[in-house]
Structures are given as structure tokens and as C-alpha cells.
């Protein structure tokens, strides 16, 4: 075996072992979130601009890289979350401004997600206790 091939194998083995060396236990703590706004039962209208706001408990971020938060929308009561409605957010963010889409539903639910690339797996925090309504667009 030539030196180049040996180096490639050693490099590949090192990369495959790296994620196991940094576990979520090393991250120190768990993630949770609670939606503040929109409130349970609140009626929103397509095109309306609102502030989505939450409180969260983050793990210790010391030594972690590539961390972000995202907020996803479900229009079927939280069974599926098919639409990311936020930009990639700093993990310490507590809100973002959102334009409500024209997706009428009586069962809108948000999922406030957190993760740190390979160091802390994407963690879901769906908010089914804070179901809200997206009304039909007014007819003009």
C-alpha cells in the first residue's frame, strides 16, 4: 500500500470517529422551548405581520459550533411539519417577525427546533398546546 492510500484510510477513520468523541452528554443539559406568541386560539390572517416569540432552555453551548434554531409550521395539528418559516436563527434568539402565509387552518402548530451540526442533534420542541388559527384570506 502506498503512503497516499494509507493517509486516506487514516483520515477517513479519524473523521468517522470524530462524532462519537463529542456527545450530547458533553454538551451539558437538554433543550426545551415554550411558545409565547402566537397564543393558543389566536386568529391570524394571511399577510399579517406578527412576532413569533418563545422562551427556551439551551444546553451549555461552550465548545459547540454550528448551532442554530429554526421554527417550522404544521397546518394539520402537529402531525407533519413541512414548512420552515424562520431563517436560521442564533440559538440565543427569542423571537423573529413572520408574515402569515395563505394556508388556512384551524390547527396551526409551531415546532421550535435547536441543533448544533454533528455536536448536538436537531432537537424538536413542537407546541401542540399552543394551537392557533390561520383564517381564510378576506375576499376583496
Residue ranges and their predicted role:
Residues 1-5:
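Positively charged n-region of N-terminal signal peptides that target proteins for export
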Amino acid at each position: 500500500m502506498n503512503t497516499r492510500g494509507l493517509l486516506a484510510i487514516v483520515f477517513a477513520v479519524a473523521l468517522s470517529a470524530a462524532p462519537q468523541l463529542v456527545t450530547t452528554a458533553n454538551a451539558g443539559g437538554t433543550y426545551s422551548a415554550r411558545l409565547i406568541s402566537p397564543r393558543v386560539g389566536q386568529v391570524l390572517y394571511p399577510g399579517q405581520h406578527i412576532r413569533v416569540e418563545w422562551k427556551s432552555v439551551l444546553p451549555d453551548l461552550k465548545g459547540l459550533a454550528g448551532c442554530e434554531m429554526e421554527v417550522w409550521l404544521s397546518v394539520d395539528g402537529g402531525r407533519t411539519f413541512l414548512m420552515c418559516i424562520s431563517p436560521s436563527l442564533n440559538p440565543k434568539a427569542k423571537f423573529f417577525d413572520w408574515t402569515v402565509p395563505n394556508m388556512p387552518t384551524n390547527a396551526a402548530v409551531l415546532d421550535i427546533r435547536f441543533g448544533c451540526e454533528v455536536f448536538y442533534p436537531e432537537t424538536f420542541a413542537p407546541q401542540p398546546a399552543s394551537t392557533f388559527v390561520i383564517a381564510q384570506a378576506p375576499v376583496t
